[in-house]
């Protein structure tokens, strides 16, 4: 359904500039609640700034500050968007360079110019190196400040921004930083039909080649259980994707699906047509993939490390994030978080719960009988009450 607007659709032969698709249709970002929320944000303050335990590039434990800036959002979302991404909820269309510099200054002041923080992660709900999203002068500020302060820098980018020209410019300011790419799946069918990513696995390969040419570190994001995929398929596919990208990635960050408001996956979840992954599946994924990143069974920082495997379950233990029965969730999430730092499978010793039998049965069912993809039974409450008609 088209929204009323003073300007209509651009017709063939008309030289007028066309409106964005999100201005023309009732996309989630154009709903009244989304518009009201966007305009309520103070553009001079970042979305959030916080510190977490991390590992330096040479394997030493450290503290890292994460700066999530409030921006215009991702250019891919302007025209289409990924099925799972709700980062548009934290954006404002009118953010400019002055606003971004004010946000950056606020982040530095909050952590005393990042004193005691070995690493700075800068996230923009899009790509820092995309000129359509982020003014070039602000890109330069982030790159230069982190270089002059001696901080390890991590930024995010889609593949299309990582041209030789752009990387040559960026490395002339900061010659040593990490670029995190949201690949999500090393599978073109999944990228197109499950995720709607807007690029191919081959485009990731080419981007990584260019990053390595400029001696930049590569962090690869993979999605666990994208929409329209069963629990067992998610586990089997993700192990294969880890194996496919490990040699080219300094770090692999697995992002278990969490439900973000106003997205395709949100609608599926509300209609009981999708359920986030089990925490047990994440433990199994780590156990099946550890030998890929540590062929000799080592720990993070050991000589056998090919890549570092990281999982930080967003909303872990909650219904809209990876969860189990509710009794064991906290303990399992904590073990997964510890593994991300230590790289030790011993973190999972002694973990058990009655719900593990139900999880195992679900995997068996997924592999033996046809079921609606990604649904699965609820894991909490009485099964009799869940199945009873309302």
Q: At which residue positions do the language-model features occur?
A:
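Active-site-proximal loop/turn and secondary-structure-junction residues that shape catalytic pockets
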Residues: 126-128, 159-161, 185-187, 224-228, ...
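Conserved C-terminal portion of the radical SAM core fold
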Residues: 202-263, 283-313
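Distinct, well-ordered alpha-helical segments
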Residues: 132-140, 163-172, 231-232
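Acidic (Asp/Glu)-rich catalytic clusters
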Residues: 108-115, 142-148, 168-176, 209-215, ...
């Amino acid at each position: 359904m088209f929204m009323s607007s003073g300007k209509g659709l651009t017709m063939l032969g008309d030289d007028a500039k066309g409106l964005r698709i999100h201005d023309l249709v009732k996309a989630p970002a154009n709903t009244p609640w989304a518009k009201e929320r966007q305009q309520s944000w103070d553009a001079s303050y970042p979305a959030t700034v916080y510190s977490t335990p991390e590992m330096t590039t040479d394997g030493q434990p450290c503290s890292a500050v994460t700066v999530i800036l409030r921006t215009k959002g991702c250019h891919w979302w302007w025209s289409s968007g990924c099925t799972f991404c709700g980062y548009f909820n934290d954006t404002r269309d009118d953010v400019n360079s002055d606003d971004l510099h004010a946000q950056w200054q606020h982040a530095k002041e909050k952590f005393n110019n990042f004193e005691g923080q070995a690493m700075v992660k800068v996230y923009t709900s899009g790509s820092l190196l995309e000129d359509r999203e982020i003014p070039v002068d602000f890109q330069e500020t982030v790159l230069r400040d982190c270089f002059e302060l001696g901080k390890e820098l991590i930024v995010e980018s889609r593949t299309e921004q990582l041209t030789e020209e752009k990387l040559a410019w960026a490395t002339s300011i900061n010659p040593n930083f990490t670029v995190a790419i949201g690949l999500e799946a090393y599978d073109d069918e999944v990228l197109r039909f499950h995720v709607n990513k807007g690029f191919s696995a081959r485009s990731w390969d080419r981007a990584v080649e260019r990053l390595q040419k400029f001696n930049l570190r590569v962090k690869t994001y993979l999605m666990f259980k994208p929409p329209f995929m069963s629990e067992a398929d998610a586990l089997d596919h993700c192990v294969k994707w880890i194996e496919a990208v490990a040699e080219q990635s300094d770090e692999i960050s697995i992002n278990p699906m969490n439900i973000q408001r106003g997205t395709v996956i949100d609608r599926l979840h509300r209609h009981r047509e999708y359920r986030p992954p089990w925490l047990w599946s994440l433990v199994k994924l780590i156990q099946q993939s550890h030998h890929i990143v540590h062929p000799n069974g080592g720990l993070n920082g050991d000589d056998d490390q090919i890549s570092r495997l990281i999982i930080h379950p967003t909303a872990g233990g909650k219904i809209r994030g990876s969860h189990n029965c509710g009794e064991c969730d906290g303990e399992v999430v904590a073990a997964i978080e510890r593994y991300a730092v230590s790289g030790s499978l011993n973190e999972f010793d002694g973990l058990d719960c009655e719900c593990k039998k139900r999880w195992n049965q679900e995997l068996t069912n997924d592999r033996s009988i046809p079921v609606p993809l990604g649904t699965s039974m609820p894991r909490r409450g009485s099964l009799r009450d869940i199945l009873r008609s309302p």
